[in-house]
Every structure is written in C-alpha cells, then in structure tokens.
C-alpha cells in the first residue's frame, strides 16, 4: 500500500483495504451512512476501483457534488481533495485485472464493494450502494439505489473518489506501457486503444476475460467477461 504525501490518496492491491480517517467515534454509529460506488467496470485494462465515503456531520457541507461522469477531470480533483479532507472515513479498494479475470468483473465489483464497506465499518452503521445489487457479507445493513450517483451525496462522493483514484493509477500505468496511451482513455475501448491492442498485443494490465483482448490474443471464441467461469472469492460475492 502506498500513500501520497501531498494528498493522502491511497493505492492498494486487490487483497487489501485502504482507509483514511480522523474518526472521533470509538464504535460504529448506525446513523452514519456510507455511500459506495465503483469506477472502471467497463474498461479493457486496469483495475476496478470501489470507494466508500462517510461524511462527517460536524464538518461543512461540500457544494458541487455530482456523479463523477458529469464532472471534468479538473473538477473531480478539486472535489476529491475536499471529500477526503471533510469525510469522517473513506476507503478505496482496487481489484486488479488478474482477479477480474479469475472471478469475472461482476463478482470483482461485489468483492470490492464488500471490502470498501469493511474499510469504514468502524464508524458507519448503514451503506447505500449505487446500483441494483447489495453484496452479501457486509458488516451492517445496506440498500441498493439505482442511479444513486446522481441522487445521494455520499454516493456521489464515493464515485468521485473511486474515479480519481483509478484515473491516477492509469496515468501511472501509462508510464509503464506508453504504447497503449492509458493516460488518454484510462483503459476504455476507444478506437486508438483497440488499434494499439491489435498492434502490440495485451500487456499484463489487460483483462483477458474481455472479448476485444481475447481477440487480440487470437482466441477463436471471444468470450465476454460474464461468460468466463467464476471461481469463488472469500465465499461472499453473490448479491442478494
């Protein structure tokens, strides 16, 4: 696990949780809600990032929150700094491409959500998760909220933290694999990325369970991520 000295951002491997907190509470408070969202389910390369954010009710409200997809990169960075400064607790989990290929992207997202929630379980007592599924094995009750990243402020904050964390990592991966231009498309399936994939083949960051990557490998059957057989991970991945 690494921590940036300038902004306290945390990057973690798939097997770990990450947490930053200034919590004054010794035990969880059922009135405090963790917003949970992911970034990077669809790309052909890189991890899926899941964040959980619990706002500090004693700190000022953050203005300008929105779904991260509706914000410019510059605005996301600005809001990210405010979120991690004013949050009571926040966590970010990255599930890497190898784990995604092993258990599939859906299960990897469920795993990331559970680990992200566990990272703030010492202060929160309820989770509100963007989407229509709640992973099993959470430490406290939760609900799924379709379109939550446009409706709930804590989910909006989680979407921003997840997106900024992942985008920063993809820029770092660009330095290792400049031929793919991860800094521009962040691993998504753009024409330029597909062309680079055909020219250079996949790198270790590519998700081999995704059809375009499989085609670049010359496999006859290009299975999509959800067609690939799943292996269990911690036994707690299936959604309720």
UniProtKB/Swiss-Prot annotation:
E.C. no: 3.1.26.4
Family annotation (SUPFAM superfamilies): Ribonuclease H-like
Domain RNase H type-2, residue spans: 31-222
Subcellular location as annotated: Cytoplasm
Known catalytic reactions: Endonucleolytic cleavage to 5'-phosphomonoester
GN (gene name): rnhB
GO cellular component: cytoplasm; ribonuclease H2 complex
Xref: CDD domains: RNase_HII_bacteria_HII_like (cd07182)
Binding site for a divalent metal cation: 37-38, 130
Enzyme class, spelled out: hydrolase
Listed cofactors: Mn(2+); Mg(2+)
Protein name: Ribonuclease HII
Regions that span the bilayer: none
Details of cofactor binding: Manganese or magnesium. Binds 1 divalent metal ion per monomer in the absence of substrate. May bind a second metal ion after substrate binding.
GO molecular function per UniProt: manganese ion binding; RNA binding; RNA-DNA hybrid ribonuclease activity
Entry keywords, A to Z: Cytoplasm, Endonuclease, Hydrolase, Manganese, Metal-binding, Nuclease
GO biological process: DNA replication, removal of RNA primer; mismatch repair
Main location (coarse class): cytoplasm
InterPro entries attached to this UniProt entry: RNase_HII, RNase_HII/HIII, RNase_HII/HIII_dom, RNaseH-like_sf, RNaseH_sf
Family to which this protein belongs: Belongs to the RNase HII family.
HAMAP family membership: RNase_HII_B (MF_00052_B)
Described purpose of this protein according to its UniProt entry: Endonuclease that specifically degrades the RNA of RNA-DNA hybrids.
